[in-house]
UniProtKB/Swiss-Prot annotation:
Transmembrane region(s): 21-41
Cofactor(s) annotated in UniProt: Mg(2+)
Localization in the cell: Mitochondrion outer membrane; Peroxisome membrane; Microsome membrane; Endoplasmic reticulum membrane
Organism expressing this protein natively: Homo sapiens (Human)
Stretches assigned to the Cytoplasmic side: 42-720
Pfam families: AMP-binding
Catalytic activity: a long-chain fatty acid + ATP + CoA = a long-chain fatty acyl-CoA + AMP + diphosphate; (5Z,8Z,11Z,14Z)-eicosatetraenoate + ATP + CoA = (5Z,8Z,11Z,14Z)-eicosatetraenoyl-CoA + AMP + diphosphate; (E)-hexadec-2-enoate + ATP + CoA = (2E)-hexadecenoyl-CoA + AMP + diphosphate; 15-hydroxy-(5Z,8Z,11Z,13E)-eicosatetraenoate + ATP + CoA = 15-hydroxy-(5Z,8Z,11Z,13E)-eicosatetraenoyl-CoA + AMP + diphosphate
PROSITE patterns named among the record's database cross-references: AMP_BINDING
GO cellular component: endoplasmic reticulum; endoplasmic reticulum membrane; Golgi apparatus; lipid droplet; membrane; mitochondrial outer membrane; perinuclear region of cytoplasm; peroxisomal membrane
Record GO terms (molecular function): arachidonate-CoA ligase activity; ATP binding; long-chain fatty acid-CoA ligase activity; medium-chain fatty acid-CoA ligase activity; palmitoyl-CoA ligase activity; protein domain specific binding; protein kinase binding
Function, in words: Acyl-CoA synthetases (ACSL) activates long-chain fatty acids for both synthesis of cellular lipids, and degradation via beta-oxidation. Required for the incorporation of fatty acids into phosphatidylcholine, the major phospholipid located on the surface of VLDL (very low density lipoproteins). Has mainly an anabolic role in energy metabolism. Mediates hepatic lipogenesis. Preferentially uses myristate, laurate, arachidonate and eicosapentaenoate as substrates. Both isoforms exhibit the same level of activity.
Descriptive protein name: Fatty acid CoA ligase Acsl3
InterPro entries found in the cross-reference section: AMP-binding_CS, AMP-dep_synth/lig_dom, ANL_N_sf
Modified positions (Phosphoserine) in chain numbering: 683
């Protein structure tokens, strides 16, 4: 068993409210259309299915623990995009010289901002946005150069840390390029981090300068700057806040424009600056937090360049005609890598946010255009939660259609699903049935990149069908500079993450405790190890954790132990099947330590034993509870509920009452909202070593518990 839902998407069920004669006629037209389109397809087009079925990766030798490499890198792993461009400043200089006057970074002008009163009395900010205003490659290069020089004038030294705590926007990328040019080590922080995590990261990295926005300065930084004693300069990317004088003595607030002006003046005096080496740290990327405070991952210039080299190889015909929409956090390795790939290939990057992405987004005033409608991107990265939200919204619209429209949509959906499985295109369905759905993302998307968490087969196939494009599902970690695997554009299989990128190799290590071995049949299984130049330098000021997760082999190659369990399919594609640690990443990106949740709740008088469960396909935690018989019986009496022990444990009312007790205890134990179980299953039977659900030491056997409660897991999460 594994932690995944089915890897096979299901068809939509037809509601037979349509006239049978009309239905028969529609089926006849579909059959006729299929025959007519198949003939030219057969003679003039190579089947996508043939490409999908080809071998994509191979083991480098015949040993069970052999590393797998892409068939395009069997003779050696790729490490650079362009010859001689071995640092990020050289990559940008190359791109600037090649695409000098081409548009690079775009931002929409805010035309108007209004308060809109909702039916419940709440007030939402709504905006009307104008066209995209663009900076060319030359513009960005000059601004980055001047900003870096200005930071140097403020006392920033090469190989010292500088933090960026800012939303995704053009200024973020300009600041990053400045740091790459001047060899400043960029400490990246999520804009959603809480106060203690921000303080920890800033103090651990000993930064004196931080780049931020007015809003984050006012809402988050202002309250904690007194806890960061080394901080001297705060640079706001969008103007100085009106209350800047409130800050502690010794801290100066600058605008980005002022720092650029300072740098431009100094550059006229030809101030020299230090250039980075490939082995120098480019980024210290703080994770969003897992077991407590976030860790900083040290990523060198060569790590990032190797990673984006692998990513770029999986995007065919990438070039000047492409437009990428940037809205995910740039502090996440997926977004940073995707934007650096685009920047290095002449693509335009238009900035957005989850609140302004589409016409229906929460901050867009009704009747005005969202960012995708205005930008019409060809490339987009998304996390599964966003794709799931799109899926649910579209299906809600489908359910509101007339009976005829709904059945026509379902017929077209199922027909296209069948054709996709055979590697064929459906131009009529795309033009007449799915055009309106496709327009939700601008109408021009040719590739969706998905990462951050596993994507369900149903949602992946929905995106394929309704948005008429492949989904490049990938697997990578911050610790591997985002590199690992990405599925190829013509591979329409679901439930897997593709073959290793050309910059890295992957092997499977036996995990005896979990019962996974690289000698397993029919497919080798084990803990996923990633090797190659993209594997990062380790954790900042955390040597013990670095030694636990990284190692070098006899050839000097660096490897990362991911803690994820995978299996290689016959064509060399990787499938994630389990997780070694009890640390689980929820669909929205939060990390939950199942052991931490259990520790907070297992000492309750009402609880004899508890197992928390979560997976990356869903956004909440559930639990299995062995209740204390005396306490549960007393609780039932107080609530007026009667029945046998089994009846009480199987009672929905009793589950809800126990859940209330657990929730109160979780809040008292200071668990985060996303860590608190939302649904539970009460077990009338105790867990003993004889049942096989716990060890002789009464430690939970998670794999066996998951198998035992599989039906309850499906009930509590619901099937798609």
């Amino acid at each position: 068993m594994n932690n995944h839902v089915s890897s096979k998407p299901s068809t939509m069920k037809l509601k037979h409210t349509i006239n049978p004669i009309l239905l028969y006629f529609i089926h006849f037209l579909i059959s006729l259309y299929t025959i007519l389109t198949y003939i030219p397809f057969y003679f003039f087009s190579e089947s996508r299915q043939e490409k999908s079925n080809r071998i994509k990766a191979k083991p480098v030798n015949s040993k069970p623990d052999s590393a797998y490499r892409s068939v395009n890198s069997l003779d050696g792993l790729a490490s650079v995009l362009y010859p001689g461009c071995d640092t990020l400043d050289k990559v940008f200089t190359y791109a600037k010289n090649k695409f000098k006057n081409k548009r690079l970074l775009g931002t929409r002008e805010v035309l108007n901002e209004e308060d809109e009163v909702q039916p419940n009395g709440k007030i939402f900010k709504k905006v009307i946005l104008g066209q995209y205003n663009w900076l060319s490659y030359e513009d960005v290069f000059v601004r980055a150069f001047n900003f870096g020089n200005g930071l140097q004038m403020l006392g920033q030294k090469p190989k010292t840390n500088i933090a960026i705590f800012c939303e995704t926007r053009a200024e973020w990328m300009i600041a990053a390029q400045a740091c790459f040019m001047y060899n400043f080590q960029l400490v990246t922080l999520y804009a959603t981090l809480g106060g203690p995590a921000i303080v920890h990261a800033l103090n651990e990295t000993e930064v004196t300068n931080i780049i931020t926005s007015k809003e984050l300065l006012q809402t988050k930084l202002k309250d904690i700057v007194s806890l960061v004693p080394r901080l001297r300069h705060i640079i706001t990317v969008d103007g100085k806040p009106p209350t800047w004088s409130e800050f502690p003595k010794g801290i100066i607030v600058h605008t980005m424009a002022a720092v650029e002006a300072l740098g431009a003046k100094a550059s006229m005096e030809n101030q020299p600056h230090s250039k980075p080496l490939p082995s120098d740290i480019a980024v210290i990327m703080y994770t969003s937090g897992s077991t407590g405070l976030p860790k900083g991952v040290m990523i060198s210039h060569s790590n990032i360049i190797a990673g984006i080299t692998g990513m770029a190889e999986r995007i065919p015909e990438l070039g000047e005609e492409d437009v990428y929409i940037g809205y995910l956090p740039l502090a996440h390795v997926l977004e940073l890598s995707a934007e650096l790939v685009c920047l290095s290939h002449g693509c335009r990057i238009g900035y957005s946010s989850p609140q302004t992405l589409a016409d229906q987004s929460s901050k867009i005033k009704k009747g005005s255009k969202g960012d995708t409608s205005m930008l019409k991107p060809t490339l987009m990265a998304a996390v599964p939660e966003i794709m799931d939200r799109i899926y649910k919204n579209v299906m809600n619209k489908v359910s509101e259609m007339s009976s005829f429209q709904r059945n026509l949509f379902i017929l077209a959906y199922n027909y296209k699903m069948e054709q996709i499985s055979k590697g064929r295109n459906t131009p009529l369905c795309d033009s007449f049935v799915f055009r309106k759905v496709r327009s939700l993302l601008g109408g021009n998307i040719r590739l969706l990149l998905c990462g951050g968490a596993p994507l369900s087969a149903t949602t992946q196939r929905f995106m394929n069908i309704c948005f008429c494009c492949p989904v490049g599902q990938g697997y990578g970690l911050t610790e591997s500079a985002g590199a690992g695997t990405i599925s190829e554009v013509w591979d329409y299989n679901t439930g897997r993450v593709g073959a290793p990128l050309v910059c890295c190799e992957i092997k499977l290590k036996n995990w005896e405790e979990g019962g996974y071995f690289n000698t397993d049949k029919p497919h080798p299984r084990g803990e996923i190890l990633i090797g190659g130049q993209s594997v990062t330098m380790g954790y900042y000021k955390n040597e013990a954790k670095t030694k636990a997760d990284f190692f070098e082999d006899e050839n000097g190659q660096r490897w990362l132990c991911t803690g994820d369990i995978g299996e290689f399919e016959p064509d060399g594609c990787l499938k994630i099947i389990d997780r070694k640690k009890d640390l689980v990443k929820l669909q929205a990106g939060e990390y939950v330590s199942l052991g931490k949740v259990e520790a907070a709740l297992k000492n309750l008088p009402l609880v004899d034993n508890i197992c928390a469960y979560a997976n990356s396909y869903h956004s909440y935690v559930i639990g299995f509870v062995v209740p204390n018989q005396k306490e549960l019986t007393e609780l039932a009496r107080k609530k007026g509920l009667k029945g046998t022990w089994e009846e009480l444990c199987n009672s929905c009312e009793m589950e809800n009452e126990v859940l209330k007790v657990l929730s109160e205890a979780a809040i008292s134990a200071s668990l985060e909202k996303f860590e608190i179980p939302v649904k539970i299953r009460l077990s009338p039977e105790p867990w003993t070593p004889e049942t096989g659900l716990v060890t002789d030491a009464f430690k939970l056997k998670r794999k066996e518990l998951k198998t035992h409660y599989q039906a309850d897991i499906e009930r509590m999460y619901g099937r798609k």
